[in-house]
């Protein structure tokens, strides 16, 4: 029997694929399967040499990467409803190029990546996985993006910038109930009240569409959710704009990383390859292609401090 969680994830993927023609017509990015604008890299001798001699890839000569098509611009299905495209697939291609390997992207339900990785189905997972102390017990990480939430407002809003709690005093926000964003904004509100400032007003919604309706209808001043999603919506609809970003682990930094099996030996080569891609400029070009340069890291780290349990 297929687990209910997996079945729901697959159903969401199928529904997303069914809506691809309409999505492609509206998309500000190239969602075609050919991807002629994809950034490519040369082989990186240093990174190749860092792969342990005894390391066995799932398929010889191929980097097999588990990836979850959760939505643009990070990862989604192309207009052929089978090719996976987006910022994470582009980054995976750069890593495969650097290691002198072909790339095989294997779509998966996001909740299934830990089991798939530990069971040896994939060499790595590149799918918006955040570094946490709990995950570090079983996996190795090479960071490649910042985990950010975005503050977005209507294009004609008088709210121009949110960088810290005091900037949000007295404003109303649409946010997902039970999310990390809600946790952070509640703490911001407490800090403001303690400082004699107005609290934040939070309106909780279960889905993105409702949050955006609240913003566009003037019920709230600001919408808060994962940054990349809002970048895509802003570029597509042109009626909202970014006024700030927020670490997904505030007050701590939140890292997104290539994930590999603990002790597999591949992590050092992946970190080295990523840093050389950063130095060459190709890394930032790949992020810019999907509008998420704000999420660029200055350098890749191996197993940095991860977020604690909240």
In which residue ranges do the predicted regions lie?
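Flexible hinge/capping segments at coil-to-helix
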Residues: 155-173
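A ligand-binding cleft/hinge motif common to bilobed small-molecule-binding domains
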Residues: 112-115, 129-136, 184-193, 217-252
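Short helices/loops that flank or line small-molecule/ion binding pockets
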Residues: 94-98, 106-107, 111-124, 138-139, ...
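N-terminal export leaders
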Residues: 4-8
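Periplasmic-binding protein-like
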Residues: 146-153, 235-272, 292-310
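Extracytoplasmic small-molecule ligand-binding "clamshell" domains
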Residues: 30-128, 289
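Ligand-binding clefts/hinges and TM-proximal coupling segments of bilobed small-molecule sensing domains
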Residues: 30-47, 180-195, 242, 275-310
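Ligand-binding cleft/hinge of the Venus flytrap
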Residues: 78-79, 93-99, 181-204, 234-238
């Amino acid at each position: 029997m297929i687990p209910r969680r997996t079945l729901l994830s697959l159903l969401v993927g199928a529904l997303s694929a069914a809506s691809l023609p309409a999505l492609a017509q509206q998309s500000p990015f190239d969602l075609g399967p050919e991807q002629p604008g994809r950034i490519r890299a040369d082989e990186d001798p240093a990174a190749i040499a860092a792969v342990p001699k005894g390391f066995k890839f799932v398929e010889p000569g191929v980097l097999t990467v588990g990836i979850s098509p959760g939505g643009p611009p990070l990862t989604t299905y192309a207009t052929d409803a089978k090719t996976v495209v987006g910022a994470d697939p582009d980054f995976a291609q750069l890593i495969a190029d650097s290691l002198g390997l072909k790339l095989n992207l294997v779509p998966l339900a996001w909740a299934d990546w830990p089991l798939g990785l530990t069971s040896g189905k994939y060499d790595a997972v590149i799918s918006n996985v955040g570094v946490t102390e709990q995950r570090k017990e079983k996996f190795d990480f090479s960071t490649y993006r910042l985990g950010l939430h975005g503050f977005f407002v209507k294009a004609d809003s008088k709210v121009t910038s949110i960088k810290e709690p005091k900037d949000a005093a007295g404003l109303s926000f649409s946010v997902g109930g039970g999310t990390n964003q809600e946790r952070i904004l509640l703490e911001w509100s407490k800090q403001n009240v303690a400082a004699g400032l107005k609290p934040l007003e939070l309106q909780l919604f279960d889905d993105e569409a409702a949050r955006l309706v609240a913003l566009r209808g003037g019920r709230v001043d600001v919408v808060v959710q994962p940054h990349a999603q809002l970048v895509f919506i802003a570029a597509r609809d042109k009626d909202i704009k970014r006024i700030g970003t927020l670490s997904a682990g505030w007050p701590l930094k939140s890292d997104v990383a290539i994930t590999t099996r603990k002790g597999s030996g591949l992590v050092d080569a992946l970190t080295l390859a990523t840093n050389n891609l950063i130095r060459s400029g190709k890394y930032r070009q790949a992020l810019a292609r999907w509008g998420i340069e704000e999420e660029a890291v200055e350098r890749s780290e191996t197993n940095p401090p991860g977020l604690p349990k909240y």
